[in-house]
Curated annotation (Swiss-Prot):
It comes from Staphylococcus aureus (strain MSSA476). HAMAP family: IF_2_B (MF_00100_B). Residues 207-376 form the tr-type G domain. The gene is infB. This is Translation initiation factor IF-2. Residues 94-108 have a biased composition (Basic residues). Belongs to the TRAFAC class translation factor GTPase superfamily. Classic translation factor GTPase family. IF-2 subfamily. Residues 59-77 have a biased composition (Low complexity). Keywords: Cytoplasm, GTP-binding, Initiation factor, Nucleotide-binding, Protein biosynthesis.
Amino acid sequence: MSKQRIYEYAKELNLKSKEIIDELKSMNIEVSNHMQALEDDQIKALDKKFKKEQKNDNKQSTQNNHQKSNNQNQNKGQQKDNKKNQQQNNKGNKGNKKNNRNNKKNNKNNKPQNQPAAPKEIPSKVTYQEGITVGEFADKLNVESSEIIKKLFLLGIVANINQSLNQETIELIADDYGVEVEEEVVINEEDLSIYFEDEKDDPEAIERPAVVTIMGHVDHGKTTLLDSIRHTKVTAGEAGGITQHIGAYQIENDGKKITFLDTPGHAAFTTMRARGAQVTDITILVVAADDGVMPQTIEAINHAKEAEVPIIVAVNKIDKPTSNPDRVMQELTEYGLIPEDWGGETIFVPLSALSGDGIDDLLEMIGLVAEVQELKANPKNRAVGTVIEAELDKSRGPSASLLVQNGTLNVGDAIVVGNTYGRIRAMVNDLGQRIKMAGPSTPVEITGINDVPQAGDRFVVFSDEKQARRIGESRHEASIVQQRQESKNVSLDNLFEQMKQGEMKDLNVIIKGDVQGSVEALAASLMKIDVEGVNVRIIHTAVGAINESDVTLANASNGIIIGFNVRPDSGAKRAAEAENVDMRLHRVIYNVIEEIESAMKGLLDPEFEEQVIGQAEVRQTFKVSKVGTIAGCYVTEGKITRNAGVRIIRDGIVQYEGELDTLKRFKDDAKEVAKGYECGITIENYNDLKEGDVIEAFEMVEIKR
């Protein structure tokens, strides 16, 4: 147990440290300052002195207060006496005033002692959000920020009170205090996908109609099949038949409803999936019995498989003399669609959309597949779903066809649809009837939104119109920012596409190199490239590192930058990222020519892309026999990793490119060294390192095309 210091003892008794020091000196005890530790016998001697005095002071204060009370009562009784008595009373009062002054003085000395606040207990569990700072984490642990900073320093992390902590560091500190930590998941209310949940586990969920999409090759009978189902199952007497085209419709078969999406082919299907909309439960693949598998048939199979949607094959046109259903089955087995009769799991239904034969069998199979899938939704929830179609009507304004996927949609609901918002003014079903509510898997057309959304956008109903407006406006602003950030500049990756669209006549190129001879040779070689439809135009050449003005010129002229044996400086890197300017860095002229020529011919398909992960500045060099040159470095950007490739840059010009030999922190090998730390580096097969050189670390990252 640590000994008590003089200032701590004084604080405990609400006294000044000087009083304790004086008393100790009177006891012939040598005292240097208030930080001196007290021995047990010294504390006992001080306790006798000061605690006894405090008891006496408290006792005297109580007596004086009692006397004051008696004097006040006596004064009240004597007010009825004569003048003489009053004068005597006045004399007495003078005495009382004196006593009162003494009492006040005593009371002043005997104020309640300001005991130090008890330290807050460290909680057993704390929650934190990503990006929590040292100060915020210290508050949650009920400790001083300086304590956390000390612990971080011992872990080799130099931090201040406003520094953000990562998950690993937070867990290490919490473990040191014996505290359990849990990261809070911050829900972004603008992300509409969080409102879409699987309703199978909801106890209040009930069965919902299946949503079916019909796909297939051109002229194989998709539209005819849709019309046949529609006319078979929907009577013309229902509100004048189908009077409203909203991109979907519902039919009833054996007391169960089925929703069909009347989408224009695979493009819309793909667009919806690209926007995250998974609306289809079952895919009907229409294949003509007299034609077999065609390119769009394969495309449809791939779409359905990627979406993990069950496929029912409708073999159409069986009434034709040239039909051969067995050939269709045989061809489809090559794509993993094996009929049940042949030991597979795919349902095949032969039918004729023109005559109506087999339509009932198809609907029955749809019902069976839907039953196996256990499609459920909770109609008591607020509605969520997907946009099927949208348009701007001259008389009604923006309108959207929606498919309700869960919950119930009502007229008057506050709604966010994609990047638009509003309150539903009117709602029309697939029969053209005005309705007030629509349950799960029901297609409806609504009006009342402020703008036209896109097909595949999601919609969510909110209880508060202000909230819907705020989220809708915020999503709209975010989409504008995203559109502005999207690349409009030419790059070698999109060059061929722009050439095909007739947008590119000249490819503007800026060349920066290490020496003038290389720059001139490269410019001459590029000018010789001859590809029909586009010309190479050199708009600027210079010697030296790529700088910010080069990026500005490339952005203004819609050009690309080629660096030959040079690197961009930090300002140029930031500007290129902000303006989406394409920079290509090479060390071999042939590679430059080949890359640009391939891009112009539409053959460019790079699999890997270089990613710079960090930079270190050489502060000092040491020559060691049998080892070579060791560079004492300071990491200025990112991090240096043991397995990264490196290049040595001197005055913006690449001197050498190779690999790290060793990476050390003090005497220990390190896997990586982060920004702000010093390290020792040796380069494999390279010893010509000098102070001021920049070591750039990079790695090759596989990119998707």
